[in-house]
Amino acid sequence: MSVEQEVINLGKNIFFNAHHSPMGCSPVFTLGYPGQSGGFDLELGSPPNQNIYIGLQDDGQERYRAFPFFGEGLDERDRYTTDESDSGSSERHSVQQEESGLIIPYNRDEIVRRFGAAIDEWQAGDLTFRLISPFEGVPDPETATEEQLRFALMPAVLAEITVDNTRGTSTRKAFFGLQNNDPVSAIRRLEDVTGGRICGIGQGRHTAIARAIRDYQRRIFYDGIDSQAKGSGKPPVWPWSGRAVLMDTPAGEKATYRFGLCFYRPVRHNRNRCSYYYSRYFANIEEVAEYALAQFNRKLEVARQADALVNDAKLSEDQKFIVAHAIRSYYGSTELLEHDGKPLWIVNEGEYRMMNTFDLLVDQLFYELKMNPWTVKNELDLYTSRYSYRDTVDFPGDATEYPGGISFTHDMGVANSFSLPGYSSYELHAIDDCFSHMTHEQLVNWVLSATVYVHQTNDREWLEPQPADSGASLDSMVNRDHPDPSQRTGMMGLDSSRTMGGRKSPPIQPGRLVGASAEQHLFAGKSWAAYVAMEKLFRDNGRKSAAALAGRQPELGAGTITSHLLPGGIFQPSFRRTMTPRSSLRSRVLSSRYTPDAKKRWIQTADSVHILRRCPRI
């Protein structure tokens, strides 16, 4: 990718963080917003706020210009002195920084950014920095070769620094480094543990910036970001806070330096004792670094093809930007795990880190079916085997129970910890609104995901034992409409017994849709689509009776929706059934069918939830 190539038109605002992630490994290298806001993110829920130093020496000067991905910070040595460790040390250090002017950020109007789905590039003056995050279909571990999996699951992204010193009159130093923000591990030199094959820096044993020895001209590790960059000739020392690699580019030359930004954390996930699948092929981060550098050219070609996937699409510039961002964040949330010798595909819910959240699984369904359909089947299989359950249903305000059926949990756990079988980390009992059980929606999500998967792959063998094929999903959906077939509307009308006196909630923030209900806004279209998909499935399989029932429901739903159109086709979202007005959770529990002891427990739960609702979601 040449520096002249335009990827996506960013407009005026080019300063935003973006994820740069390998596939199925969970880590992210975040970069793009000025200041101390990016860095190495290994299973975190937010950017690590790490100083990242990428800069170049001015020609003939002892001054450096750098991309503005770092902020002011105290010299770490101040903590170890007796005379200047008081409150005045911060002011002293700031004055020294300002007077010395050793490292000066580029002005924002000097920087050009070229942003794609896989390649992100910054250019200022004679310095270009490029981050490369290749992505392609993740091979199915059940059928792929060992080398195919090693190549695809390599836990590293790549980087290039290009220094154009063709017009220079002196040798110029470029640097690439970071601030140590790990309270447990110091930054170490990679050549000390690789027999000199790799140079670079590692933060503990989990992250590293690596380069091949044959590829570099000079390396310096320096104490703080400015104490040895002037090239005093003194040997490098062990640093307190920051390290970097310095590269010399002679006058009249243009050079490109390649790096692997590597991650390694083999064993993760509580309860199920899973490990990252890539740990089958890499024993430590040094092996990751050597492999990443050896495969640089192949990975770069994959990244170029990935960029073209989005750039050549018939989308607007805004759409391309959104898709590129979504792909980056998606891969930064993915984990391919191994459990009892079998692959387990996990997609975390961004900063919330809930695992395989079902309402997101259905959102990313078409992308996964395009790139790696086996992951959809893998997720659905785990939902069926571990995170499905059966319930009864009731009308709000009425303790009478009716048959319910099969459904699925909101998620499979949170923050690398699987939840108990049949339960999510999100859903709670005996509450209204957020965090209540989302039984109907997850059932609809399962139907949509399963039917689309079968339609796209024609995997009939997988379908046969599934709830969608057996009719269990259809029975469960119509039971949640109305127990009397003559009163069905194609909408959800009953709540799950799992709400235990509470109310079913849609995954929207309270107040976003004033006066809305789950029936009104979220499930009308999705339920209609699920019924249509099941009708086709049953007809294709010769299940005429089930197909007729599935076909009747979307007709009822469409009639319910269109009956609320105003003159001129204006939609009035008020197709809610007539229901008992909401009462307080406390009074509802007291009047419910539960025993006195159970009522007492649920009232205590309600009081606790009332307090929790005032807190942030995470």
Curated annotation (Swiss-Prot):
It holds the Pfam family Glyco_hydro_52. Its EC number is 3.2.1.37. Residues 76-100, 463-509 are annotated as: Disordered. The keyword Hydrolase applies. It comes from the Bacteria. GO terms for cellular component: extracellular region. One of its GO terms (biological process) is xylan catabolic process. It catalyses: Hydrolysis of (1->4)-beta-D-xylans, to remove successive D-xylose residues from the non-reducing termini. GO terms for molecular function: xylan 1,4-beta-xylosidase activity. InterPro entries: Glyco_hydro_52. It is found in: Secreted. Keywords: Carbohydrate metabolism, Glycosidase, Hydrolase, Polysaccharide degradation, Secreted, Signal, Xylan degradation. Pathway: Glycan degradation; xylan degradation. The keyword Ribosomal protein does not apply. Belongs to the glycosyl hydrolase 52 family. This is Beta-xylosidase. The gene is xylA.
